[in-house]
C-alpha cells in the first residue's frame, strides 16, 4: 500500500456522496507479455493483489495491476484467476503437468490468463473450470485449496478461526464477504476478539452472516457496513418503507435469506 501511494497512485475518486471514499486510481507503464501497457485503472484491490502477488511469488505491483486489468477486460474473476495460476505453478513445480508455468513468471501469467479466457489447451481449459476439476484431472488434490470449487481468498483460515468457519459454511464457497469476521478478528469491529481462539467463533460467524444478508439486500457496501449495525439498519429500513419492524424481525429476515440460499443449493444438488 505504501509503495502504491508513493509511486503509482494518481487520484482518489469516490462513489457519489460516500463518506468512506475507498476508491483509488493508479497509472502504470510496464512491459508484460512482450507488450507495453499504459493503464489507468482502479487501484490494486487487496484480494487479487494477493493472488497475483505473493501467492504467485511476484513482488511487482505494476505487473499485478496489468494482470487484474486483463481479468477485468476478459470478464473473469481476478481472485479466482490468480489462485488458479498459483495452483498451476505448484503443479508445474511438482511435475504434475506439462507446459505449465513457473513461479513469478509474469509473461507466462499474462499469456495463461488469455488461454484460460479462451479455453485454449488442456491445462487452461481445465483451470477455467476451477480447482476441483483441476485436482481430479491432474491428480493434484494436495494443491487444491477451495470450498465448493471456490478458492480461498487472502484471509488465512489457519490463523482466523471465524473466517475458517465462514469458508466452510458459506453458501457460495470460500467467500470472505458472506460473513466478514476479520472485522472483529483483525479490526476490532464492533469489538476485538482473538483470531486464533476457536471459542465462540461459530456464533460470531452466524451473527456476521445474518447481518451481511441484510446489508447486501440493502445494497450497502462492506466498508460502510463497518460503521453500522442492526440499529442503523432498522432505522434505514423503516425510513425507506414506512414500516415499523424491530431489530429481531430484521435479524430473522437475514436468517431466512441465508437459509433460503442453502435450501436452493440443496435443491439443485
Sequence positions of predicted segments:
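Extended C-terminal regions of large enzymes
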Residues: 1-269
Amino acid at each position: 500500500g505504501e509503495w502504491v501511494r508513493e509511486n503509482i497512485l494518481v487520484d482518489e475518486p469516490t462513489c457519489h456522496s460516500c463518506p468512506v471514499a475507498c476508491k483509488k486510481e493508479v497509472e502504470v507503464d510496464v512491459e508484460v507479455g512482450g507488450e507495453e501497457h499504459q493503464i489507468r485503472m482502479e487501484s490494486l484491490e487487496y484480494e487479487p493483489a494477493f493472488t497475483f502477488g505473493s501467492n504467485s511469488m511476484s513482488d511487482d505491483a505494476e505487473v499485478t495491476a496489468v494482470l487484474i486489468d486483463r481479468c477485468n477486460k476478459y470478464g473473469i474473476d481476478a481472485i479466482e484467476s490468480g489462485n488458479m495460476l498459483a495452483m498451476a505453478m505448484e503443479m508445474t513445480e511438482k511435475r504434475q503437468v506439462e507446459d505449465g508455468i513457473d513461479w513469478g513468471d509474469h509473461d507466462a501469467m499474462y499469456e495463461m490468463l488469455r488461454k484460460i479466457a479462451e479455453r485454449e489447451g488442456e491445462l487452461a481449459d481445465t483451470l477455467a473450470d476451477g480447482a476441483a476439476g483441476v485436482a481430479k484431472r491432474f491428480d493434484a488434490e494436495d494443491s487444491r485449496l477451495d470450498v465448493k470449487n471456490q478458492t480461498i481468498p487472502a484471509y488465512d483460515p489457519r490463523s482466523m478461526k471465524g473466517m475458517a468457519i465462514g469458508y466452510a459454511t458459506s453458501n457460495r464457497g470460500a467467500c470472505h464477504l458472506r460473513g466478514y469476521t476479520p472485522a472483529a478478528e483483525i479490526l476490532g469491529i464492533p469489538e476485538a476478539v482473538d483470531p486464533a481462539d476457536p471459542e465462540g467463533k461459530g456464533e460470531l460467524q452466524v451473527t456476521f452472516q445474518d447481518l451481511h444478508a441484510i446489508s447486501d439486500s440493502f445494497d450497502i457496501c462492506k466498508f460502510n457496513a463497518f460503521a453500522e449495525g442492526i440499529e442503523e439498519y432498522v432505522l434505514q429500513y423503516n425510513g425507506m418503507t414506512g414500516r415499523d419492524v424491530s431489530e429481531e424481525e430484521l435479524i430473522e429476515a437475514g436468517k431466512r435469506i441465508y437459509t433460503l440460499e442453502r435450501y436452493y443449493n440443496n435443491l439443485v444438488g
